[in-house]
Structure formats: structure tokens, C-alpha cells
Amino acid sequence: MYTSGRYLVQFDPYTERHYIKNIAKRHSDRQWQATRKSIEFVLEHIEKHILTDKAETIHVSDAGRIIKLYFKIAGTKDSAKRSSNRAVVFLNDKLCVARVLLIYSKEEICDPNETARWQKIVDDQFPEIMRKFSSR
């Protein structure tokens, strides 16, 4: 099911309009562009990173996987996990496409439960993807 190929990375317009915009406001354009390139690189080679603490698999089906990627903003001192920055990504393993559904800071969506909150957002905004994981 999994591939050793390179993934094509796509940022969903929803995350561009909402969460990326908020993160980009808090940091310089240079920091955000470097961070985005880093996220793209990691996702292009996600199979190497899924085995580390930078990413974790959340849901798996024949259609693909949903993963959570931990990342830090370029030029900051925190580790990827401690930075509280996350990306929720749908991996279509058959097409080798990594579709970034959400990029957020835990500060933005932490209450009352981060996981429940981002899952609800993904359920609401991406029902066509979540139907693929309906047995969860």
C-alpha cells in the first residue's frame, strides 16, 4: 500500500485562506516561506519521516492515510513537537499525493480538545476525504 516514491504536495485552498494566513501574520514572510519549503520537503519524502517523531499516522484505509505532521517555524528555537505547530495531511498512496488539509498552531484550536477540534474541522470541510475513513 505504501510507496517509496516522492509525493506531490498540494496545499488545500481552505488551509491557505484560514490557518496559513494566521501563522504567516505572526512571522516574517521569509520565515514562513522557509517553513513552507521545509514542510513540502518532508511531505515529498514522508515515508522516511513517518518513522520518526515528526509525523504520526492517524487513520488508514485502502484510499490512503491521514497523518499529523509536527513542524517548527524556521528561525525559532523550539523542536517541531514542542512548537505546537501541526499539519493534517491526506496521503493518497496510489497517486503519491500529499494534500495538506490543515496547518495550525495548537494555540488556535486547542480548546477543549485539539484532536476533537481538528477532526471536526476536517469532517466539516473535507467530507469527501473523511468518507474514505468512515469505519473509524
Over which residues does each language-model region extend?
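Arg/Lys-rich, positively charged N-terminal/basic patches that mediate binding to nucleic acids
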Residues: 1-43, 130-136
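A generic structural signal for short, solvent-exposed coil/turn residues
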Residues: 1-3, 61, 92
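A general secondary-structure signal for short beta-strands and their flanking turns/coil
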Residues: 4, 64-66, 84
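Alpha-helical interaction segments
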Residues: 9, 22, 60-61, 107-108, ...
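Residue-level signal for alpha-helical context at structural boundaries
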Residues: 33-37, 57, 106
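Short alpha-helix boundary/capping elements
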Residues: 43, 47, 93-96
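A short, surface-exposed loop/turn module that caps and links secondary-structure elements
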Residues: 45-77
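Enriched for short, Lys/Arg-rich terminal
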Residues: 74-136
